[in-house]
């Protein structure tokens, strides 16, 4: 019986153990690979704040000196230029995304379906980082009506809510998703067909 107990202890210690891996909060890669992305400087700052021991291991002066000593002078210069290019490119992409997000308009439209039936169509939320399906579900619950995500002819997605709730949707978006979608980017678009019909 003592032999059986000994074999059990040995077999349990031979089983593979799970490893705890730290992932970067900026680029979502392990910190060892952050240098290959475009956000190396931000990744280093994040690691310094959140895991100082690993930061010391990866970015200490001795480690950097050891890594640089294996490179030739030309390779060092190339590595420095590449790192600068990657950082500049990442900064440019980030500013473009912010500009695009600031310029993106969310259009809320009232569309006539039948003689007295209307739907409200909301387009452009995905540009502000909102998930159309989740927002459609929230709208359906909020207004107790049918709400779905549909494809528009241009190939994008839009949310269709049954009923004429343009003003209410505008107020709700400002109240609930005001951080993601600034009020200046929300606009109610009038249906041009109705204006023509009213003019005649």
UniProtKB/Swiss-Prot annotation:
InterPro entries: DENR/SUI1_TIF, DENR_C, DENR_eukaryotes, DENR_N, SUI1, SUI1_dom_sf. GO terms for biological process: formation of translation preinitiation complex; translation reinitiation. It is found in: Cytoplasm. One of its GO terms (cellular component) is cytoplasm. Disulfide bonds: none annotated. Keywords: Cytoplasm, Ribonucleoprotein, Ribosomal protein. One of its GO terms (molecular function) is translation initiation factor activity. Residues 106-177 form the SUI1 domain. It holds the Pfam family DENR_N. The SUI1 domain may be involved in RNA binding. Belongs to the DENR family. Interacts with the 40S ribosomal subunit. This is Translation machinery-associated protein 22. It comes from Coccidioides immitis (strain RS). The gene is TMA22.
């Amino acid at each position: 019986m003592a032999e059986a107990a000994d074999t059990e202890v040995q077999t349990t210690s031979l089983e593979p153990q799970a490893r705890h891996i730290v992932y970067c909060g900026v680029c979502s890669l392990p910190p060892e690979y952050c240098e290959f992305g475009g956000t190396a400087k931000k990744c280093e700052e994040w690691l310094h704040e959140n895991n100082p021991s690993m930061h010391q291991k990866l970015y200490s002066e001795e480690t950097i000196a050891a890594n640089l000593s294996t490179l030739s002078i030309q390779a060092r210069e190339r590595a420095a230029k590449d790192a600068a290019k990657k950082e500049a490119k990442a900064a440019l992409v980030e500013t473009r995304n912010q500009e695009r997000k600031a310029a993106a308009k969310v259009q809320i439209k009232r569309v006539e379906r039948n003689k007295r039936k209307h739907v409200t169509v909301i387009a452009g939320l995905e540009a502000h980082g909102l998930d159309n399906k989740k927002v459609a579900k929230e709208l359906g619950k909020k207004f107790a009506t049918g709400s779905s995500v549909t494809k528009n002819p241009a190939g994008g997605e839009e949310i269709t809510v049954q009923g004429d709730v343009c003003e209410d949707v505008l107020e709700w978006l400002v109240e609930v998703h005001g951080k993601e979608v600034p009020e200046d980017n929300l606009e109610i678009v009038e249906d041009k067909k109705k204006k023509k019909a009213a003019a005649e």
